[in-house]
Each structure stands twice: as C-alpha cells, then as structure tokens.
C-alpha cells in the first residue's frame, strides 16, 4: 500500500495545507485508491467549505471511488492523460534497457500521479510520498522552457512520434526536454508547458505527425472568434515553428499573474462522470448547469456564459466538447466558477455535440439551444440577441482564417463546420 499525502495550495492559503491521505493499493494490474481526510482539515473553515469531489464527503474515515471506478476524479484531474503517460512509459522503457530499472517494472496510476512535475501540475493539489520530502515530482529541472525553445521542443515531439519503437539514440534527450514541462498535461496530442518573458506559464500544443490538416491554426481561429463573441477564453497565439502547421499556445488559467495556483476540476469530476461518458449515455450540458446552481459562486453569470458556449459550439461544430473539455475553478470561500473555455476545435463533418443539449438530444441545432435557454436563466429575448450576434461574428471565420495564414484549401475543407453561421 502506497501512502500519498494530499495538500491544498490554492492562492488564498498562507501555506500548503494537508487535506488528507490517499492510500493506493495494488489489485492485479491496477491501483485501487482510498482517501481519508485529515481531522485537522475537516475542522479548518478554510478547507472544509466545499466539496472537491462528489465522491469525497466531509467526514472522517476512509472513502472509496464509485462503482466500477478505481480512482477519484479530483486526483485524476491532476494526473497525466495519454500524452503525459506516453512520455513516462517511454522513459521507463529506456531505463529498463539501460539497467536503471528492474525488468518487469510496471507503471501504476499512482506512479503517473506522482510522476507529474509539481511545478507544472494542473490545479492546486500537491502530493508527497509518505508525507516526506518535497512535493512530487521534483526531477528533471525546475524552470519551464522559454518561448525561444519552442522550435526545439516541437522538433523533439515530432521525433518522438516518428520513433514508435523508442529506439533512437536521441530518444532520451527528447524525453528530457519534454517530460518535465509536458508530462502534467491532459489530452492525447503532443504539448508542453512553456514560460513567457514574464514567467507566466502557457501550454504549447504542437502539431502531430498524424495531422492531415492544420489543427493548431484552426484552434486559434476558433479562439479568436470566441473572444470576439465575448466568451471567457484564455489568451491564445499561434505560430509555425518546425512544420507547416501552427503551434497553438494558450495561457494557463489555473495560475494567477503572480504564479499562485488556482484549483481546477473538470466537469467530469464535478458531475461524477467517467471517461467515455457522452451523449450516448445521457451526459448533458444540463448537468454542468446543475453544478453551477448547487455550488456556483456566481451562478447567474456562469449559467449565461455556459449557454452562450453551447450556441458557439453549435456554430463552429466543436464536437469534441466532452466532460474533460469543460472545467471549473475553485473560488475559495464561495464555491465554484466556470473556467475559461478551452480545447475548442471545429470539425468539418460533424453530426452532434459530445454532450446533449436537452436531456436526450445533442444535434447541431440552434432550436435545441433556444429550448433550454430558460434553464440557464437566459430570457427568450436575450437568447435571440446572443444567437444573432454570434452568427454575425462566426460568419467572419474565413477572414480570421486568412489572417492566420490558413490556405484556401484548408478553408474550403473546413467550411462545412461553420455553415450554421450563415443567416
């Protein structure tokens, strides 16, 4: 049984405070987690004011994940997803070959959790093994790479993708460059945390060797359109470095201007959903609205924002809007607020959103958005005004695409994604 001390370190706390302990047992080929609150944390009004995970209640004793689950969402949110796990697996493969790790060594969920570099970990939860030493992981350097290293980082990510057998002589150097700044981040696509000249962290999302269109360029276009619509979206920039496709960089919204941490929870965690839950099993935007109604610090404002994002997603055919691609930020002492919008990408030939708009319909249909507007506390008059304004803005997508440097062929291929913006 691995004992992991869990600390809270969001911006309003004077110092990191221990929330409790995560017990990671091994069952066959996976970990089974149990969590218990620190008694002092339960008595601390700065820590016990809100639920961090629907599966973890504010009481003493060990608590367990939901049925058919092995981990809690709150900890999954600060663990690596497919890209980060790939980097860690590649490093272990090389360590075994070089005699630095015993043959047969396997990575468990707890290894992925503790293998994320503490400096770049998403959110404001931090971890210590056996409640000793530094917060983990603390290997592989301290500083995020500066923007000037983006070309080299992108080249390393492309080289890594082009070496599926992990045999290249330069592979360990590529991993050294990528694993600290990139192992903490979610999603399957290659990426890394980088720092601007003021030390602010950004996520650089690199082109993949498997791309057949400019994914980063189009994500930038959608980000610009969302900003012009008045949606809350993190600052983004796009530039070409080591390929003809754009690297899209977005400023991290889980850090303050002074480097403090903001606690982030995915919609998957806050709705008690699991990976893969989508419209086909009833996952809906109405569930996100319920989170804001029950736990929101500014529910009226955020419900309106959330409904507006539904309209926008329909207009740009952002059909990768699954539960991990929506999130909340902790507003200490008050509850939760909707995070900045992120991971919005147009899809040229799309059938429906990943989440239902009504209880049972996910169609790319503005009538569905109109139907549920009242649930999001948006009046019929306001709904029509928002839809009309958004259509006008999104209707300028080709102009933004040209300014971004996307070719006519790219524009022709992506045009179907924006067809609902035409009045």
Tell what function each PLM region has.
Residues 1-323, 327-423:
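Phosphate/dinucleotide-binding and metal-coordinating scaffold of catalytic cores
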């Amino acid at each position: 049984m691995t004992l992991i001390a869990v600390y809270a370190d969001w911006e309003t706390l004077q110092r990191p405070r221990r929330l409790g302990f995560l017990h990671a047992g091994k069952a066959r080929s996976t970990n089974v987690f149990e969590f218990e609150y620190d008694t002092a944390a339960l008595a601390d009004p700065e820590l016990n004011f809100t639920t961090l995970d629907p599966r973890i209640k504010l009481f003493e004793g060990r608590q367990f994940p939901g049925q058919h689950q092995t981990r809690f969402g709150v900890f999954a949110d600060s663990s690596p997803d497919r890209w980060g796990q790939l980097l860690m697996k590649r490093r272990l493969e090389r360590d075994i070959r070089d005699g630095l790790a015993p043959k047969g060594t396997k990575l468990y969920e707890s290894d992925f959790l503790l293998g994320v570099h503490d400096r770049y970990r998403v959110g404001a939860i931090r971890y210590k093994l056996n409640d000793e030493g530094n917060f983990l992981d603390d290997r592989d350097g301290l500083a995020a790479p500066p923007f000037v290293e983006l070309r080299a980082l992108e080249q390393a990510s492309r080289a890594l993708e082009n070496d599926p057998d992990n045999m290249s002589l330069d592979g360990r150097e590529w991993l050294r460059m990528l694993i600290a700044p990139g192992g903490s981040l979610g999603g399957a696509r290659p990426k890394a945390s980088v720092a601007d000249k003021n030390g602010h962290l950004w996520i650089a999302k690199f082109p993949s060797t498997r791309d057949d269109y400019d994914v980063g360029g189009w994500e930038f276009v959608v980000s610009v359109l969302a900003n012009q619509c008045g949606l809350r979206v993190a600052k983004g920039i796009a530039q070409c470095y080591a390929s003809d496709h754009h690297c899209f960089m977005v400023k991290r919204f889980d850090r303050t201007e002074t480097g403090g941490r903001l606690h982030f929870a995915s919609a998957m965690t806050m709705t008690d959903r699991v990976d893969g839950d989508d419209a086909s099993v009833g996952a809906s935007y109405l569930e996100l609205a319920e989170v804001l109604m029950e736990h929101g610090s500014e529910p009226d404002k955020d419900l309106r924002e959330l409904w507006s994002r539904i309209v926008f997603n329909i207009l740009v055919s952002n059909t990768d809007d699954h539960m991990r691609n929506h999130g909340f930020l902790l507003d200490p002492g008050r509850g939760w607020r909707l995070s900045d919008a992120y991971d919005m990408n147009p899809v040229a030939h799309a059938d429906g959103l990943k989440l239902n708009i009504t209880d049972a319909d996910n169609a790319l249909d503005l009538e569905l958005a109109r139907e549920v507007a009242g649930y999001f506390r948006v009046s019929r008059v306001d709904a029509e005004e928002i839809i009309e304004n958004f259509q006008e803005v999104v209707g300028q997508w080709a102009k933004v695409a040209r300014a971004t440097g996307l070719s006519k062929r790219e524009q022709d291929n992506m045009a179907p994604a924006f067809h609902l913006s035409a009045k």
